[in-house]
């Protein structure tokens, strides 16, 4: 019997998280001492473990009349006292828990990131915390915010929003602030806005950095600014909220029926932080879907992480996505407390009144439950495919770029989460075409040109450096439910030394400890397959390949997956590429009911045309025509 997401369930999880966090605090109450992989920001305890918990505490204490006391397993935790203690100790230069001195003027410093939510949480809780502070405590807090709110040389990415929220919240508190800085950041947003709700995370449009920062910085910080300072510029507020509303139209399509997210990009250690934007959008009437759909999305997404061990036994958040997933999901900047950016979800959730209709609305199905869909997003260069039969979602990426394992795969699928760990310093070839000289393994680097289009195709040109040469690859992908076709035209650099080979992985089939995947293949028919837990991945060669690899852990490393503790990867190979070599294969990611021997028969013809276009004809007679790529990538 299906269990709807309730306020009681949310409160129980919140109480567990508060208890785990409170038990991790140092003696000052301004830093956390947690297990994990520490970095430089953990020296003396993680300040981020406290500053980021302020998202949740600020939301919880923002509602008048709500008790500050949270109870978990017989213990009581006074969240107002914990918040005040953190703010006082963290901003007192004489405290051992002090959050740090000022950087060089204008430098980008991690504490500038934290200053936004420190200021915003103080504004949210002004009646309980700010007004109860002594003059000296308020002076220390404002001085700390000012130290980390000085003008930088330029606005270079989403960090601009941290400066803006710092100053806007101080303005709302009646403290000193810089209106020119706030206005400058709001103007910066126009320079990186690409339309349809999407922001390019760079100093200007055209760098093609699209990922979850659209949710957990651009959208959330615009929504935060709208709450504390939006009334001062109502026209600008409404314009920015309309952009959020456009972005929110897309959001539900990235979630599977079971609440899984098509994980992709950096900072995935922040986990369910992505729920903050839709919840605040709902609060500010910028959520364009039903309240019931939002309730289902929030509940299922939180459960997905909890059910997979993202919250440890002691009630603290892990840096990995799940209990078994690779810790290599974390970037070097992710300290032990950095994961508490996830508290954005609870900050937005608890900003809703206890009697909000959100808690009583009848849950409504997510798009992946309603029917099959293909959504094309030209701005980030994505195609998102949902399959009702399995409830799974696949995100195909042609245009966005950054770290190779987290951005360079062809597809990021809820049914087959990507391998994030590196083997011998190189990404696993799952959902990648990798050139190799026998020593080095290439991967998709900078995308030279890309385009996506209806009814769900992608085309991209990129380079790989292998064997002393820079080789060019033109890849076309056409999607059709759980199956997609990949076609590559590889042009080798004539100056390269020695032969160049290929390995191309399907997608990794992840499985939990104790499970045993079924593995099969047919070298003559040209397919390989693996299945476990009701899921399957398969790859079949149509043209250009001369070998294949039975599904196994890449280089014997079965600890590379972002979600699962184990995986296997079926792959195709080419022993030696010709100067211009064309490759075509078909990949299945989804339910285990697939018959791999029938995959190749789904395609009647797939070929490049004289004008540079690519034509695919499926066996049912339907066809897809993909136009040639431009020689240079136009600004988006």
PLM region descriptions:
Residues 43-47, 55-64, 76-279:
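Aromatic-lined, polymer-binding surfaces characteristic
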Residues 69-72:
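Long, charge-dense tracts
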Residues 90-101, 141, 146, 256-263, ...:
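Carbohydrate-active enzyme catalytic cores, enriched for enzymes
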Residues 367-452:
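Low-complexity, glycine/alanine/valine/leucine- and proline-rich hydrophobic stretches
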Residues 1-49, 81-86:
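Low-complexity, Ser/Thr/Pro/Gly-enriched N-terminal "stalk/linker" regions
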């Amino acid at each position: 019997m299906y269990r709807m997401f309730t306020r009681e369930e949310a409160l129980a999880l919140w109480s567990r998280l508060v208890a785990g966090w409170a038990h991790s605090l140092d003696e000052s109450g301004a830093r956390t001492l947690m297990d994990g992989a520490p970095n430089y920001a953990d020296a003396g305890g993680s300040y981020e473990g406290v500053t980021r918990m302020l998202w949740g505490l600020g939301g919880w204490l923002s509602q008048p009349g709500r008790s500050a006391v949270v109870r978990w397993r017989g213990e009581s935790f006074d969240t107002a006292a914990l918040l005040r203690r953190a703010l006082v100790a963290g901003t007192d230069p004489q405290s051992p828990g002090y959050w740090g001195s000022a950087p060089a003027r204008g430098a980008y410093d991690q504490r500038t990131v934290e200053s936004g939510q420190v200021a915003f949480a103080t504004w949210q809780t002004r009646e309980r915390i700010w007004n109860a502070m002594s003059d000296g405590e308020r002076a220390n807090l404002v001085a700390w915010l000012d130290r980390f709110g000085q003008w930088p040389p330029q606005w270079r990415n989403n960090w601009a929003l941290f400066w803006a929220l710092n100053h806007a919240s101080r303005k709302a508190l009646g403290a000193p602030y810089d209106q020119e800085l706030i206005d400058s950041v709001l103007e910066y947003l126009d320079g990186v806005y690409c339309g349809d709700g999407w922001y390019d995370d760079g100093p200007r449009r055209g760098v093609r950095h699209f990922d979850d920062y659209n949710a957990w910085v651009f959208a959330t910080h615009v929504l935060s600014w709208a709450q504390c300072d939006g009334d001062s510029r109502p026209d600008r507020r409404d314009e920015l909220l309309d952009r959020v509303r456009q972005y929110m139209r897309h959001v539900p399509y990235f979630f599977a029926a079971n609440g899984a997210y098509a994980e992709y990009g950096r900072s995935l250690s922040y986990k369910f932080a992505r729920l903050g934007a839709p919840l605040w959008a709902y609060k500010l009437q910028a959520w364009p879907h039903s309240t019931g759909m939002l309730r289902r999305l929030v509940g299922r997404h939180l459960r997905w992480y909890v059910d997979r061990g993202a919250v440890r036994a002691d009630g603290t958040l892990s840096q990995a996505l799940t209990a078994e997933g690779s810790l290599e999901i974390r970037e070097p900047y992710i300290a032990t407390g950095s994961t508490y950016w996830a508290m954005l979800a609870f900050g937005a959730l608890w900003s809703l009144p206890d009697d909000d209709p959100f808690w009583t609305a009848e849950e409504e199905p997510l798009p992946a439950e309603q029917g099959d869909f293909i959504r094309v997003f030209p701005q980030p260069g994505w195609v998102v495919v949902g399959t009702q039969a399995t409830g799974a979602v696949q995100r195909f990426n042609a245009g966005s770029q950054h770290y190779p394992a987290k951005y360079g795969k062809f597809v990021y699928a809820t049914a087959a989460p990507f391998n994030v760990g590196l083997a011998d310093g190189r990404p696993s070839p799952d959902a990648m075409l990798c050139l190799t000289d026998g020593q080095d393994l290439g991967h998709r680097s900078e995308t030279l040109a890309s385009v996506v289009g209806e009814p769900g195709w992608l085309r991209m040109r990129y380079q790989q450096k292998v064997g002393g040469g820079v080789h060019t690859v033109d890849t076309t992908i056409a999607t059709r439910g759980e199956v997609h076709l990949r076609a590559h035209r590889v042009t080798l650099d004539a100056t390269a030394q020695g032969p160049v080979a290929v390995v191309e992985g399907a997608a990794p089939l992840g499985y939990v400890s104790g499970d045993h995947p079924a593995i099969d293949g047919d070298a003559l028919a040209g397919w390989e397959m693996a299945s476990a837990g009701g899921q399957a991945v398969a790859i079949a060669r149509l043209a250009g390949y001369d070998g294949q690899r039975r599904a196994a852990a890449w280089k014997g490393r079965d600890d590379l997956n972002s979600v699962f503790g184990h995986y296997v990867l079926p792959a195709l190979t080419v022993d030696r590429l010709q100067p211009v070599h064309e490759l075509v294969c078909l990949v299945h990611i989804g339910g285990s009911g697939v018959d791999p021997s029938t995959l190749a028969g789904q395609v009647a013809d797939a070929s490049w045309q004289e004008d540079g276009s690519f034509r695919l004809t499926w066996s049912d007679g339907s066809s897809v025509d993909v136009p040639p790529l431009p020689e240079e990538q136009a600004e988006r």
